[in-house]
Design a protein with these regions (language model features):
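N-terminal beta1-alpha1 ligand-phosphate binding loop
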Residues: 1-29
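Glycine-rich phosphate/pyrophosphate-binding loop and the adjoining helix
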Residues: 5, 26, 64, 137-185
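Short, glycine/serine-rich, charged loops/turns that create anion-binding
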Residues: 7-8, 38, 118-119
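A structural preference for short, hydrophobic beta-strand core positions in alpha/beta folds
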Residues: 32-35, 144
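N-terminal beta-loop-helix "entrance" segment that forms/cooperates
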Residues: 36-56, 154-159
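Helix-loop-strand module that forms the ligand-binding subsite of alpha/beta enzymes
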Residues: 53-147
Length: 185
């Protein structure tokens, strides 16, 4: 499952997530793309109803997105860099996923991260670290982009369709997430 945290449809982040999903599909995984920027989602209001009921009190598209995450064996989560971190759209998903963590519904699912920025060292690693932290808190298994790079994940710069390193690290990540998810399922 690819999750695009960008508010822009068909932008640089979506391009790399799609490349990763294509590689995951080539490795044998069933693939699906979710665009948070196109979803009707609200931020967490800290009402704590999820603590009592196990479900979020807000009725919006997040419910369906979280259900898809529970059914998926692996995730590729992408975000553009916004002030060294993830977008508000992706942060809402993280905050609203509390009901999943309560029962560790993402435990042992495989996850990887992609970040795009305006320059090669434009905050991609800190953005990826935020996604990794989310996955670790959910007790998911975090993977990087694998051999030959063996770094944090997909890192894109500018016009990602022309960024060979960004394309390669994202494809490597997609393949790696799929291979491990298939082995574990």
């Amino acid at each position: 499952m690819g999750i695009v945290g960008s508010p822009r449809k068909e932008g640089n982040t979506e391009n790399l997530v799609k490349e990763a999903l294509k590689a995951a599909g080539d490795a044998g995984a069933d693939i699906e793309l979710v665009r948070l920027g196109s979803a009707e989602i609200e931020p967490c209001v800290a009402c704590d109803i999820c603590k009592a009921t196990g479900e979020c009190a807000i009725y919006d598209d997040m419910r369906e997105i979280l259900e898809k995450m529970v059914k998926a064996h692996g995730f590729i989560i992408g975000s553009p860099v916004y002030f060294g971190n993830v977008t508000s759209q992706l942060k809402m998903l993280m905050d609203r996923s509390r009901p999943l963590r309560m029962d560790f519904k993402l435990k042992n699912k495989v996850g990887g991260a992609i970040a795009t920025g305006g320059s090669r060292n434009g905050g991609q690693e800190t953005t990826i670290a935020a996604i990794h932290e989310f996955l670790l808190i959910q007790d998911a298994i975090v993977v990087g982009d694998g051999v030959p790079m063996a770094h944090y994940g997909g890192t894109g710069v500018g016009a990602t369709a022309e960024d060979e390193m960004g394309l390669q690290t994202s494809k490597n990540l997609g393949k790696r997430v799929a291979e491990l998810a298939i082995k574990l399922s």
